[in-house]
Design a protein with these regions (language model features):
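Ferredoxin-type iron-sulfur electron-transfer modules and their immediate structural context
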Residues: 2-225, 229-232
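A generic structural motif
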Residues: 164-167, 237-241
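Conserved small/polar residues in nucleotide/adenosyl-binding loops
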Residues: 245-247
Length: 247
């Protein structure tokens, strides 16, 4: 009986000593957490999409609290979240425009010529390994196999009649689809942009017309019609400088 009591006492004393030691070490090596970082993190939506350029919401919160990122850096939260974070940081929200993803192709199944019917893996990233880079005759357009659809965390992009179509209302401009498209057909543009070029072909006009009914042929008529001088034609494709367009 005495042995049991002694053993229990020894265990208790050892536990007490270890507890005190751990408590001391915890205080000595404790990492101070900025309360602003905690408050900012609480306002971020938590999607961890990476659209802000940081690894996730935790990393962005730390950067904002340290003054290394703008209060409006979260594309998902938008202006409402930016205002809340600005209040926490004691700053103001800068001018920002709502952005949305845009697919530079209108060559759907009805307008774009197909060389053959493809029934293989439905993934745009494997197309460089199949004949002609995919079934469509145009080697610049949307392949329509949905790599961008899989990448979107907001269900904002779908394949409709053979091409990717963005739902502007759902799009949070996180940029994941932009990074995923192997043909670099997707870019972020202002949400309210009305003048766009839905083509990326660099082929000459005659070649474009032979594979697509709606492709840009580089005729330069748009450059002559634009009163703002915002449209240029380079490599047989029209480009619009949206900063020069007065909507």
């Amino acid at each position: 009986m005495t042995g049991i009591i002694i053993a229990a006492a020894v265990v208790s004393i050892v536990g007490l000593i270890l507890g005190l030691f751990l408590g001391f070490m915890g205080k000595k090596f404790a990492v101070e957490v900025d309360q602003k970082e905690i408050d900012v993190r609480a306002e971020l939506p938590g999607n961890n999409c990476g659209g802000c350029g940081y690894a996730g919401c935790d990393a962005l919160a730390k950067a904002i609290a340290a003054g290394e990122a703008e209060v409006g850096a979260c594309p998902v939260g938008g202006e409402p979240v930016a205002k809340k974070i600005a209040a926490i940081m004691g700053s103001e929200v800068g001018d920002s425009k709502r952005m949305t993803a845009f697919v530079k192709c209108a060559g759907d199944c009805e307008k774009a010529k197909e060389n053959y019917h493809y029934t293989g893996v439905q993934d745009c990233t494997v197309m460089p390994f199949v004949p002609n880079g995919g079934s469509k005759a145009c080697t610049y357009g949307c392949m329509g196999y949905g790599s961008c659809v899989k990448a979107c965390p907001f269900d904002a992009i779908h394949i409709v009649n053979g091409i990717a179509v963005v739902d502007k209302e759902k799009c949070k401009a996180c940029g994941k689809c932009v990074a995923t498209c192997p043909r670099h057909l997707i870019e972020l543009i202002p949400y309210d942009a009305k003048q766009v070029v839905k083509c990326a072909s660099k082929d000459k006009g005659k070649d474009v017309m032979s594979v697509c009914q709606t492709g840009c042929i580089g005729c330069m008529m748009c450059t002559k019609q634009c009163e703002f001088g915002a449209i240029t034609v380079e490599n047989n494709i029209a480009h619009i400088d949206l900063s020069l367009i007065h909507i």
